[in-house]
Regions:
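Cysteine-dependent PTP/DSP-like catalytic domain, specifically the C-terminal lobe
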Residues: 33-43, 60-151
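Glycine-rich SAM-binding Motif I of class I
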Residues: 53-57
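Polar, glycine-rich mid-to-C-terminal structural blocks
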Residues: 151-165, 175
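Glycine- and aromatic-enriched alpha-helical transmembrane segments of multi-pass membrane proteins
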Residues: 169-187, 191
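Conserved helicase/translocase motor-coupling segment
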Residues: 185-205
C-alpha cells in the first residue's frame, strides 16, 4: 500500500500567526495534493464543511503553482466562536468570519509570494504564472429569506396589503440583495460579472454582459 504523510505544522503556525484560533487546521498541502489529482485545472471545488477555508487557501496556492483557473465554493454554518478564545478577542464572531478573513489574507500572500518568486527569476518564463492572471477574488453570500414582499390574502388585511405593495421589496434589503435574488430566479450564476450603468438619474445593473438588465429605481 502507498502511504501519504502530511502534517499540519505549517498550517497551524500560519493560523496562529494570524490569530485565527484554530488549534488543529487541515493541512493545506494535503488538500492541495487531493485537488491536484483532479485532471481539470478549471474545475469547481466544493467544500460543504469548510471551517477556516483551508480548501480555498489550497486552491489559490495550486492555481499560483500550475496556472490553473480552479474556483471554489465554501459552505459553512455560522457557528459561534467561544467567548474566551483568541479569535473572539480579535473581533471574529463566527467560524464564517474567520474563513472570510483567511481567504482575503491567504489570497494576498499567495499573490505577493508569486510576485516575489517571479522577480527573483527576472523574466516571465513559459511555464510561470503571471500574477496579473491570478484570480484571488471571492464573493460572500448568506442564506436568508426572500427579499420580495410576501402576499397575505386574508380579506380583512387586503387593504393594508395593497399599501404594502407600493414596493415589491422589503425595506431593509439592499439593491445587491435584490439583484442576486433576481439572478437566481432567472437561473444565472452568482459568479457572473455585474456592472453598473448610469442612464440619466437611473442606475441599471448589467448582468453577464447584456444577459440581464435590472433597474430598481421607483420610476
Amino acid at each position: 500500500k502507498s502511504v501519504l504523510f502530511f502534517d499540519s505544522q505549517s498550517s497551524t503556525k500560519w493560523m496562529k500567526a494570524n490569530k485565527f484560533g484554530f488549534d488543529f487546521p487541515k493541512s493545506t498541502d494535503f488538500i492541495k495534493y487531493i485537488i491536484s489529482m483532479i485532471p481539470s485545472k478549471e474545475c469547481i471545488i466544493l467544500d460543504f464543511f469548510s471551517g477556516s477555508a483551508t480548501t480555498a487557501h489550497a486552491t489559490m496556492e495550486l492555481n499560483a503553482e500550475d496556472g490553473g483557473s480552479r474556483k471554489f465554493i465554501m459552505v459553512q454554518l455560522p457557528e459561534l466562536i467561544k467567548e474566551n478564545s483568541e479569535a473572539k478577542s480579535e473581533g471574529y464572531h463566527t467560524i464564517c468570519d474567520i474563513g472570510e478573513e483567511r481567504i482575503r489574507r491567504a489570497g494576498e500572500k499567495v499573490k505577493s509570494d508569486l510576485i516575489e518568486k517571479n522577480n527573483k527569476v527576472g523574466t516571465l518564463l513559459e511555464n510561470q504564472v503571471d500574477p496579473d492572471d491570478l484570480d484571488i477574488g471571492f464573493k460572500v453570500f448568506k442564506l436568508g429569506s426572500s427579499n420580495l414582499t410576501e402576499w397575505q390574502a386574508e380579506f380583512d388585511e387586503l387593504e393594508s396589503n395593497i399599501d404594502l405593495f407600493e414596493s415589491n421589496f422589503l425595506n431593509d434589503r439592499s439593491e445587491l440583495d435584490i439583484l442576486f435574488e433576481i439572478m437566481l430566479k432567472n437561473g444565472l450564476d452568482l459568479t457572473y460579472p455585474v456592472t453598473e450603468i448610469s442612464e440619466g438619474s437611473h442606475k441599471i445593473y448589467d448582468v453577464a454582459s447584456g444577459n440581464l438588465f435590472v433597474c430598481l429605481n421607483d420610476n
